[in-house]
């Protein structure tokens, strides 16, 4: 059986179990492009799998383990059905990376990102800078996952009763995310700009479109973000294995929300469940991790204030 045919059959199988299976499917299709769709599944060897796992840079990243898991499950499925004779993955796995510490953007860095989104392109790109800037703003101001942001449709957006419907996101949940007057005005302005660029688009169309009127590709958006971050001069030097990410905008939103509640004197423990619902977490414990990060942030802010008061910092 050809690799492409086998992979598509496996994806159909996973989805028949009730899974959305989006990320895994995307990784497996990347593997198909890597080895060639017409390659016989029986001919796949350890060397070609290792090259895919390590990527062009030959480094171990978080993606290494995600790719490994996706391939392992598919290969096991294929061996049972006789499509492959063995699992051609390397026997030794690299040491598991430490849990990724989220990067919390400062207000200054957020402004730099939003500004850079309008100026990072050296040549005309298929993604309008206005679109890229709004993707970053919506992801941060609403605390969304980037996949949720790019999946928003026009008919998901309600500007009269300010909210957006996030449909069947992670954990197959649909939720309503409200927003304030300032965000409503921001989205109203963008909707008017979008209508001028793509007249006659149906309400079922994606909110964010490229110059050809096509929905945004997630990988393209992530690639653009890396260039925007570099143009903004934002990097981390704390030994982390990757630079600030798009997803860190969501982490920043959560930490800033909790920090604001602390400063307002609110009982944060009572509010954590509502934040968990807002973020679309399946368990409150997934949201509670931000409490530790917020405590550290407030302690650091307190240190800086004391140093400033004592004339140690200018």
Regions found by a protein language model. Name each.
Residues 1-314:
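Conserved catalytic core of the tyrosine transesterase superfamily
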């Amino acid at each position: 059986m050809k690799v492409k045919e086998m992979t598509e059959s496996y994806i159909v199988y996973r989805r028949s179990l009730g899974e959305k299976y989006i990320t895994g499917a995307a990784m497996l299709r990347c593997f198909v492009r890597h080895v060639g769709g017409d390659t016989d599944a029986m001919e796949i060897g350890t060397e070609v799998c290792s090259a895919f796992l390590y990527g062009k840079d030959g480094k171990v990243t978080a993606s290494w383990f995600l790719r490994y898991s996706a391939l392992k499950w598919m290969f096991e499925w294929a061996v049972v059905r006789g499509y492959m004779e063995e699992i051609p993955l390397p026997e030794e796995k690299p040491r598991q990376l430490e849990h990724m510490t989220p990067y919390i953007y400062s207000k200054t860095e957020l402004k730099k990102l939003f500004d850079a989104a309008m100026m990072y392109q050296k040549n005309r790109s298929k993604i309008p800078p206005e679109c890229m800037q709004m993707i970053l703003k919506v992801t941060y101001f609403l605390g969304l996952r980037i996949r949720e942001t790019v999946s928003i449709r026009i008919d998901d957006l309600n500007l009269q009763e300010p909210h957006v419907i996030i449909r069947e996101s992670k954990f197959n949940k649909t939720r309503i995310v409200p927003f304030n007057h300032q965000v409503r005005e921001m989205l109203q302005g963008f909707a008017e700009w979008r209508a001028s660029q793509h007249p006659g688009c149906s309400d079922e169309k994606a909110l964010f479109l490229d110059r050809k009127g096509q929905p945004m590709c997630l990988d393209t958006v992530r690639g653009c973000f890396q260039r925007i971050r570099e143009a903004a001069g934002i990097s981390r030097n704390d030994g982390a294995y990757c630079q600030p990410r798009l997803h860190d905008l969501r982490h920043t939103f959560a930490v800033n929300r909790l920090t604001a509640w602390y400063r307002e004197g609110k009982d944060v423990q009572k509010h954590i469940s509502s934040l968990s619902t807002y973020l679309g977490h399946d368990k409150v414990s997934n949201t509670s991790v931000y409490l530790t990060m917020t405590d550290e942030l407030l302690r650091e802010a307190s240190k800086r204030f004391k140093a400033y008061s004592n004339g140690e910092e200018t």
